[in-house]
């Protein structure tokens, strides 16, 4: 009986494995993939400050970003920002970054 319970427990855990996979962490992805340019002191932050004013320089603090806009800029680039392909930043990661940058504040 005990052996049967253990086998069933392992089978249930194995079946639930993919469903328990963690969703991408938007903040961690932003820091890792975008932070070199878009955190304090980065080139992207500097350029946005010059173009849009200091209030809009830090992406994490902006309230006027939308997810479609973030995704479009990342995929196609804008001004001096290069585009990022799906191989460089998969759609699921881009979705997580866009959700992080447009979260309710």
Which residues make up each language-model segment?
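Non-catalytic alpha-helical scaffold/packing segments enriched in small hydrophobic residues
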Residues: 9-10, 25, 29, 96
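Electrostatic cytochrome c docking/interface patches
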Residues: 15-29, 45, 67
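Periplasmic/extracellular electron-transfer cofactor-ligation site
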Residues: 27-55, 72, 79-80, 103-105
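Extracytoplasmic electron-transfer domains, predominantly the class I c-type cytochrome c fold
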Residues: 53-105
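Bacterial N-terminal signal peptides
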Residues: 5-16
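Bacterial N-terminal signal peptides that target proteins for export
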Residues: 1-7, 82
């Amino acid at each position: 009986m005990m052996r049967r319970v253990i086998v069933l427990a392992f089978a249930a855990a194995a079946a639930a494995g993919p469903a328990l996979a963690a969703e991408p962490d938007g903040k961690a992805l932003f820091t890792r993939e975008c932070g070199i340019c878009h955190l304090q002191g980065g080139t992207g932050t500097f350029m946005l400050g010059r173009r849009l004013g200091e209030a809009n320089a830090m992406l994490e603090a902006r309230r006027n970003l939308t997810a479609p806009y973030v995704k479009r800029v990342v995929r196609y680039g804008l001004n001096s920002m290069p585009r990022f392909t799906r191989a460089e930043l998969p759609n699921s990661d881009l979705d997580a970054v866009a959700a992080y940058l447009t979260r309710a504040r």
